[in-house]
Amino acid sequence: MKIVSWHPVLTDHQSYTLEALQQAATCPLTVYVAKAEHPARQLQGWVNRHTASLSPQLIPQKGWFKYIVRQLRAHRDAIHLFGSPFEQPKLIVTLLLAAAMGLRVFLISEPYSPISAGYQNDRLKLINRAKAVLRPVLYRCYGALLSRRIAGVFAISPLAAIQYRGIGIAGKKIFPFGYFVPRSERLCSKTPAADSEKTGLKLIFIGTLIERKGLDVLIEAVRSLNRTELLVTLDVYGSGDSSQFDLDQAAVRYCGLIPFGEAQAVIADYDALVLPSRYDGWGVVVNEALMAGVPVICSDRAGAGAVVEKWQCGAIFASEDAPDLTGKLNEWLRAPESLAKMRLAARNAGAALDPDVAGRYMLDVLSFDTKQPAPSCPWYDYD
C-alpha cells in the first residue's frame, strides 16, 4: 500500500493522525500542501509542529498545474486522501483530476457551514450570507461529479455524513471520523481530582471571539445563574475583540491566549469546558478537554458533541438557547457528584480519541473488503 495525502495546509490535528496511519500501515506516505501556514490560524496562536516523518511538500505557485499532474501520474498506484478538499482551488482541481484519472480517492471532510456567520471573523457579512446560500448548490455539483468516482469519505461528524449522503454519496462509502490530538505529556503526573465539598462551577471557554462561537449565549447563561449569588465563574480564552462581550472580570473574565500546546494543562484546572457554538464542524477543543479528563457542555451544532453524547461525558444543549444551557449548568450545580462520574467518562473518551486509534481505524477502512461489514466507529454512534 502507498498513500498520498493532499491538504490546503497541514495542521497538528491532521498530522498526528497521518503519522499514526503511516506507522500502522508501515508504508510510504507522501504529503502535499497548498500553503505552508494558515494566516488566520497563526493569529489565533496555532503553531505547525509537523513530525519529521511527514515532511510536507509545498505545491509551487508557478507551474502548479503541471506539478500536480506529474505527481498524480507518478502515484497512480497509491491511495489519495484529500483533506478539506473544497477549501482551496488548487486542491479542487487536483481532486477532480485524480477522480478523472480513475485513482483511488478518499475525502477527509468536515460538513459545510449551514449558517451565515463568518468562520474566522465577523467581517464581510454580506459575502458570508451569499456563501451560506451557495454552499449547498456547490456541494450538489461536487456530488454529481464525484459520487461514482471516489472510494469513500471520512466524514468529520454526523452532520458531514448526512450532507454527503444528501449530495449522492452512497452510505456504504461514508465512514465516520473526527479530528485527533495526543494527550499532553504535562498531564501524565496530573490527575484531576473531584472535591465533594466544593460548591459552584468553574467553567472555561476557548475559542475565537466571534459570533459563530456563541460566547454571548454562554455569558447570558452564566449571568442568569448568578442573579442572586456568585455560583458560576467563566474564564474566556481566545483571540479577538473581547470588548464586544459583557465581561465584568469577576464572574466572567477574559484571560487572553493559551500558549499553543498548553490547552489540556489549563483545562484540567476547571470543572467543565463549554463550547456554545452556533456552528462548529468538529471542535478540537472538545478533544483537549476530554484528554484532560474534563467534562464538556456543547451545543447541538458542534460536531464533537457526538462524542460527548455517546460517552456520556458531559451534556448537549440546543444551540443559541441560553435557557437550555442555563438548565444544564443548573443540574450540575444541584448534583456536583455527577461531575465526578463524567470526569471518568471523559478520560475514557479521551483515550478513544488518541491519534493512534484514528490511524488504525483509517487503515482498516482503506484495507477493508466492501463485501464485509464496514469497520465500526470508535468515537460516536452512526447509522
Where are these regions (language model features)?
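Nucleotide-activated donor-binding/catalytic signature segment of Leloir-type glycosyltransferases, i.e.
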Residues: 243-261
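Short alpha-helical donor nucleotide-sugar binding micro-motif in glycosyltransferases
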Residues: 257-258, 265-270
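Conserved donor-binding/catalytic core segment of Leloir-type glycosyltransferases
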Residues: 193-213, 219-222
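A short, well-ordered alpha-helix in the C-terminal region of glycosyltransferases
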Residues: 338-352
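Aromatic "clamp/platform" in nucleotide-sugar-dependent glycosyltransferases that forms part
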Residues: 278
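Short hydrophobic beta-strand element within catalytic cores of glycosyltransferases
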Residues: 295-298
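Conserved acidic donor-binding segment of nucleotide-sugar-dependent glycosyltransferases
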Residues: 310-311, 315-322, 331-336
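Donor nucleotide-sugar binding/catalytic pocket of nucleotide-sugar-dependent glycosyltransferases
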Residues: 132-192, 197-198
